[in-house]
Regions:
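P-loop NTPase switch/coupling surface
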Residues: 1-214
Length: 215
């Protein structure tokens, strides 16, 4: 059974939770229910992130007019490095800046006994920012990312559907999870979440998106 482990993230001091198909959280306000839900969403959508990054990698190598992925990728980067970079950005979007977090904060999700992802912080002079977000992945997942680096082919219509089908099949077998995940914040939390992330959202927008806000 999948397992979530959290240490010192937001209001959650410690948490070790086996994740079943149906879970119901009850408790006082600001007790960490939303933090746990967001953490599960963060990890459960990693497989979708890998798929979109692999598609972006293929289209970056062989551009096709009108074909695009929902995620952008740095030119020439490996699939593993692209995933690490994206998970850092995704963490900041989901939980906010890591600068004020305890240095011993970490969270990890065990999809299976052999497949897991861990997010922790590194306070080291080698990195340009304090509390650098460090990504640790299981050997099985690392092997998959290496074996499937630049494996999707491109046709005049976009990424090969057959290649993508095989890619998804192999990926879902590693995660033992083929379900789509949707996170819907509580209505009272929507404004709070938006206000916390507004500066970051604006900073990541391109010039055209920023101009559209003024029209």
């Amino acid at each position: 059974m999948p397992k979530l482990i959290i240490n010192k993230l937001g209001p959650v001091e410690t948490c070790e939770l086996e994740c079943s198909q149906f879970m119901n959280f009850t408790g006082f306000q600001a007790s960490g229910k939303s933090t746990i839900a967001k953490a599960i969403y963060y990890f459960r959508t990693i497989k979708d992130d890998i798929i979109e990054l692999a598609k972006s990698q293929a289209l970056d190598a062989t551009p096709v007019y009108g074909a695009k992925s929902t995620l952008s990728i740095e030119h020439g980067i490996t699939l593993r490095k692209a995933l690490e970079n994206y998970l850092r950005e995704k963490f900041l979007r989901t939980f906010g800046s890591s600068w004020g977090m305890p240095n011993d904060m970490y969270m990890e999700y065990h999809f299976t006994e052999a497949c897991y992802v861990k997010i922790s912080l590194e306070n080291d002079s080698r990195y340009s920012t304090p509390n650098y977000i460090w990504i640790t992945m299981s050997n099985e997942l690392i092997r998959f990312l290496k074996a499937n680096n630049h494996t999707l082919s491109v046709t005049p219509l976009g990424v090969s559907e057959e290649d993508l089908r095989i890619f998804k099949k192999n990926l879902y077998e590693i995660f033992e999870d083929s379900c789509s995940v949707v996170y819907i914040p509580a209505g009272r939390s929507m404004i709070t979440l938006l206000s916390q992330q507004l500066s970051y959202i604006y900073a990541t927008m391109d010039d055209m998106q920023k101009r559209s806000l003024d029209t």
